[in-house]
């Protein structure tokens, strides 16, 4: 028999039936304007002893459309199995795909559709349709409408109706907000039995059907709550919520949230808890009256007659959503709930700092104290996570308000804000107390002065990490202290500079003349770099913060972004040996000491030497010895003397000063003694005098280091 189909897809199904042999056409009908194709699918490969009773040939009805996924109905007595939808009228449809139709549209055709139906039946017969790595099926079908609730614990909630494109949402708002929304009584029932069948049950339409869906008597539990609800009249909530009007209480809506444990097999702990909410009555009064209760003359609820019509009360299903909170945020970001307990102080909420903070806030990670003295200005918005509403506000305070809006202030992870810089004398006690109580300090100031002050004055026993970008915004740098603070930020800063001068690809890392003036002051300049980079690097920072506690090691890390790829440079932080000399603290790289020992040994029996590269910190009287320049080619090396040459030396010093923008420079000389003694000879003292005469012209002390057989000595001469 020839059939003329209205839809192109139906025509293609008929063509593919004969071409594939996957089934036989029974009929094509127009039912209430819908084109219904009835097909006998099969014969199929069904096991002799199937887990579920699937026939070799199954009759299905397909409602065909051209621009959506066709609906496939199976026989009415088909067993309830996973991936089967049971409609309110009892009819059953196959759940063929676990993704939206638009996601498979490009591969979807009539042949693929028919083969998918066969696959569904054959795998269902073997109980293999639901894969082991797939989430368990919900207990009831999904619904479009939803409730968005907090975890306040009250049996009363005020809900505001929000119309979306395809659904209605009821969002919890403040109970005290009597001008908006409606008050609902929210009751809950916990189903003690764990369900293991992994099937979607038919959505109940009445209170009685809801009760029949479980072995436990949830309506009896519901009834026991009536007196408790009525007793609110004896509490302060009666005035807050209902303005002491009994009519308002009686006219409250009633919601019932049911929690069901779902397991894959008998005896296992629940893999997930499924929660479904139902509006079980339009008003509290109509509900308790259906159960036979009335208000007595003593103004109490009393049962005066047997329950009659309560099982026929229509119910409305809702999906349950909880307000965003830190634990939910942690879960959604694949963290563990215990992770968010760390007390962390963040200094600096600028472009990079605000986006790091935003990442951690949205992950529910940490308990934070923010420190920043600056206000938000219009030019900041190019790379700051805040918006126009925050202009003029202190950045730290505005970020706290930002977090409050995400978590509704009930579960905020921003515990304190200090609206001053870390040098503020009036806030020192508060700043030091916050840091001493923290497990980590995150420095995002991009300020050497702040980093040094934190390292030497504030940190105490608290580990610190410093994040900053280079002037062009093409690289992110992380300086991470060791857990015991034996390696601190200041020496990691020196290792960062050394990395720049030793890696030729990084020689232009700090060069930039790209600044834009945002005010008429001489300091009113802001660096120019893409928001894209700040966003990428902030993600690396927040990820690094979450991994810090898993390792005690210190590191210097740099991520360079170029041509849509990232290159990482990583150096393990090293301990700098400390020596006191003439009122100065000498900090010298341990690996550099080893390097000088090696050069001495290689040149024996002669002496050798070179130039010391480092920096001075006059605030803390520290001399950093970071690197050396090897003995120039025209140097004279003898068993009892060393005369350092000068070939190419000045050019090398100028280059490293340019690379590090003056943060490393010439600080003195080193040479070796063939013997174990590192005492200076009279010629060494003359050398030290000449060194100091040269360096004092730049305002620096002169430094001389002598390396012996197994020890070394440092000599410092200043004014």
Explain the meaning of each model-derived region.
Residues 3, 75-169:
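Domain-scale recognition of soluble eukaryotic interaction modules
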Residues 469-565:
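Adenosine-phosphate binding glycine-rich loop
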Residues 335-375:
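Glycine-rich adenosine-cofactor-binding loop
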């Amino acid at each position: 028999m020839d059939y003329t189909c209205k839809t192109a897809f139906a025509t293609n199904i008929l063509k593919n039936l004969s071409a594939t042999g996957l089934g036989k056409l029974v009929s094509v009908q127009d039912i209430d304007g819908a084109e219904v194709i009835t097909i006998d699918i099969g014969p199929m490969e069904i096991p002799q002893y199937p887990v579920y009773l699937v026939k070799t040939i199954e009759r299905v009805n397909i409602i065909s459309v051209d621009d959506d996924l066709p609906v496939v109905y199976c026989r009415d007595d088909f067993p309830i199995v996973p991936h089967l939808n049971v409609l309110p009228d009892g009819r059953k449809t196959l759940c063929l795909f676990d993704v939206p139709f638009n996601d498979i549209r490009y591969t979807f055709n009539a042949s693929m559709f028919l083969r998918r139906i066969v696959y569904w039946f054959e795998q269902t017969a073997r109980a293999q349709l639901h894969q082991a790595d797939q989430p368990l099926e919900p207990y009831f079908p999904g619904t479009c409408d939803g409730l968005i609730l907090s975890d306040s614990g009250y049996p009363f909630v005020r809900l505001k109706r929000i119309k979306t494109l395809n659904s209605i949402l009821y969002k919890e708002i403040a109970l005290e907000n009597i001008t908006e929304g409606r008050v609902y009584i929210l009751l809950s029932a916990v189903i003690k039995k764990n369900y293991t069948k992994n099937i979607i049950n038919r959505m109940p339409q009445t209170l009685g059907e809801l009760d029949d869906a479980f072995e436990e008597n949830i309506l009896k539990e519901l009834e026991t709550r009536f007196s408790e609800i009525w007793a609110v009249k004896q509490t302060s909530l009666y005035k807050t919520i209902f303005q002491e009007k009994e009519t308002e209480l009686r006219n409250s809506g009633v919601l019932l949230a049911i929690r069901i444990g779902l397991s894959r097999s008998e005896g296992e702990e629940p893999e997930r808890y499924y929660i479904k909410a139902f509006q079980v009555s339009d008003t509290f009064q109509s509900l308790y009256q259906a159960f036979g209760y009335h208000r007595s003359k003593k103004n109490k609820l009393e049962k005066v007659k047997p329950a009659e019509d309560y099982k026929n009360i229509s119910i409305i299903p809702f999906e349950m959503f909880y307000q965003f909170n830190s634990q939910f945020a942690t879960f959604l970001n694949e963290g563990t709930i215990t992770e968010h307990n760390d007390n962390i102080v963040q200094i600096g909420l600028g472009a990079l700092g605000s986006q790091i903070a935003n990442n951690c806030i949205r992950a529910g990670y940490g308990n934070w104290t923010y420190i920043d003295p600056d206000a938000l200005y219009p030019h900041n918005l190019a790379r700051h996570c805040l918006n126009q509403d925050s202009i003029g506000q202190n950045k730290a305070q505005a970020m706290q308000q930002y977090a409050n809006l995400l978590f509704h202030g009930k579960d905020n992870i921003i515990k304190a804000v200090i609206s001053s810089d870390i040098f503020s004398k009036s806030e020192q006690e508060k700043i030091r107390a916050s840091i001493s109580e923290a497990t980590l300090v995150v420095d995002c100031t991009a300020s050497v002065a702040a980093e040094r002050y934190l390292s030497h004055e504030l940190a105490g026993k608290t580990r610190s990490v410093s994040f900053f970008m280079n002037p062009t915004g093409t690289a992110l740098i992380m300086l991470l202290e060791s857990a015991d603070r034996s390696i601190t930020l200041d020496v990691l800063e020196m290792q960062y500079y050394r990395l720049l001068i030793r890696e030729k690809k990084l020689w232009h890392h700090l060069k930039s003349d790209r600044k834009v003036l945002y005010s008429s002051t001489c300091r009113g300049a802001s660096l120019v770099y893409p928001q894209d980079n700040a966003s990428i690097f902030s993600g690396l920072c927040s990820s690094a913060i979450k991994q810090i506690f898993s390792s005690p090691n210190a590191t210097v890390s740099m991520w360079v972004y170029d041509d849509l790829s990232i290159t990482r440079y990583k150096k393990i932080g090293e301990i700098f040996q400390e020596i006191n000399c003439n009122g100065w603290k000498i900090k010298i790289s341990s690996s550099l000491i080893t390097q000088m020992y090696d050069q001495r040994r290689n040149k024996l029996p002669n002496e050798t030497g070179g130039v010391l590269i480092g920096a001075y910190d006059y605030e803390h009287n520290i001399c950093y010895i970071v690197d050396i320049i090897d003995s120039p080619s025209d140097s004279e090396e003898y068993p009892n003397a060393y005369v350092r040459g000068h070939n190419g030396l000045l050019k090398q010093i100028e280059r490293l000063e340019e690379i590090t923008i003056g943060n490393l420079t010439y600080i003195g000389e080193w040479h070796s003694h063939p013997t174990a003694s590192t005492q200076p000879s009279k010629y060494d003292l003359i050398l030290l005098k000449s060194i100091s005469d040269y360096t004092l012209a730049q305002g620096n002390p002169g430094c001389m280091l002598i390396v012996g057989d197994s020890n070394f000595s440092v000599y410092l001469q200043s004014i």
